[in-house]
Amino acid sequence: MIAAPTQLAIMPFPNIDPIALSIGPLAIHWYGIAYVAGIMLGWFYARRLARTDRLWPNDTSPISAQHLDDFILWAAGGIVLGGRIGYILFYDMAAVAANPIRAIEIWNGGMSFHGGLIGTTIAMILFARRNGIPVWSMFDIIAAVAPIGLLFGRIANFINGELWGRIADVPWAVVFPTGGPFARHPSQLYEAGLEGLVLVVLLAIAIYVFKALKTPGTVTGIFVCGYALSRIFVEFFREPDAQIGYLAGNWLTMGMVLSTPMFLLGLWAVLRARSATKSA
């Protein structure tokens, strides 16, 4: 058994009530607010990108603001359904098989980013084909704004005191209410910074400085690669899901396994975009 590290300095957990507002029997959770805030701010930024013709191929945006207005419900459905189904398939299949009603108990389990990505991708393909939008351009505009949702979502994970990191003795380690007596890495904030803030800035630079939207698929590839690398890195500090644990040794996690093919897909998307541009 590995001994816990000696902890000389820790940060107190900011004990924020997961329920932001209660109106009678209705409880509004920070997690729900984070989802709504991420979608709405992403929608606002996406509308700005769609209105800026000079960023797109032939200086003409293939996506209108009305398209984005119509896509909000599609995106929400893809995120929630894909995220929940993905969590069940990747992390909680045994428990759901034993108690099927658990599948709809979103509060008793969680959501999977990888599942949400698959669900949103399906929604984007169907929406783009229905509205005559180039699929790669649809992917690009959503990829450009997705880190905003990730930023808010990971902060909400921290407020909820969930998905905490491994035991640590760094000065910024935190004792989480549900994480036992030892201080842990605030891995949710690591993810918020890398998958959220850093990635949205990198994508903005790619779009506004290097005109990445003019080569459809480039922004998508950068996002997918960036997320995958960030997630793999943070997995070294994040506690694996208790019902799965480590898949091999004392280091390989499900998050790493799911993110590795993501990186390869992102790299393929970037190379495909460059090849298509050269042959055009």
Curated annotation (Swiss-Prot):
Cellular compartments per GO CC: plasma membrane
Functional note: Catalyzes the transfer of the diacylglyceryl group from phosphatidylglycerol to the sulfhydryl group of the N-terminal cysteine of a prolipoprotein, the first step in the formation of mature lipoproteins.
Binding site for a 1,2-diacyl-sn-glycero-3-phospho-(1'-sn-glycerol): 154
Lineage per the UniProt record: Bacteria, Pseudomonadati, Pseudomonadota, Alphaproteobacteria, Hyphomicrobiales
Metabolic or biological pathway: Protein modification; lipoprotein biosynthesis (diacylglyceryl transfer)
GO biological process: lipoprotein biosynthetic process
InterPro entries in UniProt: Lgt
Transmembrane intervals: 26-46, 71-91, 106-126, 132-152, 193-213, 217-237, 251-271
Subcellular location: Cell inner membrane
Keywords of the record: Cell inner membrane, Cell membrane, Membrane, Transferase, Transmembrane, Transmembrane helix
Domain of life of the native organism: Bacteria
E.C. code: 2.5.1.145
PROSITE patterns xrefs: LGT
Name of this protein: Phosphatidylglycerol--prolipoprotein diacylglyceryl transferase
Topology with respect to the bilayer: Multi-pass membrane protein
